[in-house]
Each structure stands twice: as C-alpha cells, then as structure tokens.
Amino acid sequence: MLKNLAKLDQTEMDKVNVDLAAAGVAFKERYNMPVIAEAVEREQPEHLRSWFRERLIAHRLASVNLSRLPYEPKLK
C-alpha cells in the first residue's frame, strides 16, 4: 500500500512525526546510544504524548526480534 504522506491532514501528519520520534528513541536504545526518552517525549505536543508512549512500547517490543549490529561511536 503506497500512500503519499504529503496528502495527509495535519493531525495524521503529527501522529506520523510522533511515531518517527518514538522509532528513533527505540533505535538508539537498541544500539546503546545515548538518548533520554523522557526528554524526547516532552518535545512532543501535549495531546500526542500518550500516542508517543504507545508507539515507543510497540517499537521496543518489535526490536526484541531484530538483530543488532555493533555500534562504534565516531572517534575524534
């Protein structure tokens, strides 16, 4: 199913953006990269914070089944 995200209404676009933020937090947690989920949650709109928590739980559960690649931070 292909969908043009630019044609979504603003409320759906906000939900997509919040879901993307939750996926980013779960990704960083999976690779033991520094991230503070509460700080990212506070950056989300007030009415979508519960959606952020739901999506974060879903992404965390999905990442249990995924393999890990070694994370090597950039050396300066």
Curated annotation (Swiss-Prot):
One of its GO terms (molecular function) is DNA binding. Signal peptide: none annotated. Pfam families: DNA_pol3_theta (PF06440). It catalyses: DNA(n) + a 2'-deoxyribonucleoside 5'-triphosphate = DNA(n+1) + diphosphate. GO terms for biological process: DNA-templated DNA replication; lagging strand elongation; leading strand elongation. Keywords: DNA replication, DNA-directed DNA polymerase, Nucleotidyltransferase, Transferase. One of its GO terms (cellular component) is DNA polymerase III, core complex. InterPro entries: DNA_pol_III_theta_bac, PolIII_theta_sf. It is an enzyme of class 2 (transferase). Its EC number is 2.7.7.7. It comes from the Bacteria. The DNA polymerase holoenzyme is a complex that contains 10 different types of subunits. These subunits are organized into 3 functionally essential subassemblies: the pol III core, the beta sliding clamp processivity factor and the clamp-loading complex. The pol III core (subunits alpha,epsilon and theta) contains the polymerase and the 3'-5' exonuclease proofreading activities. The polymerase is tethered to the template via the sliding clamp processivity factor. DNA polymerase III is a complex, multichain enzyme responsible for most of the replicative synthesis in bacteria. This DNA polymerase also exhibits 3' to 5' exonuclease activity. The exact function of the theta subunit is unknown. This is DNA polymerase III subunit theta. The gene is holE.
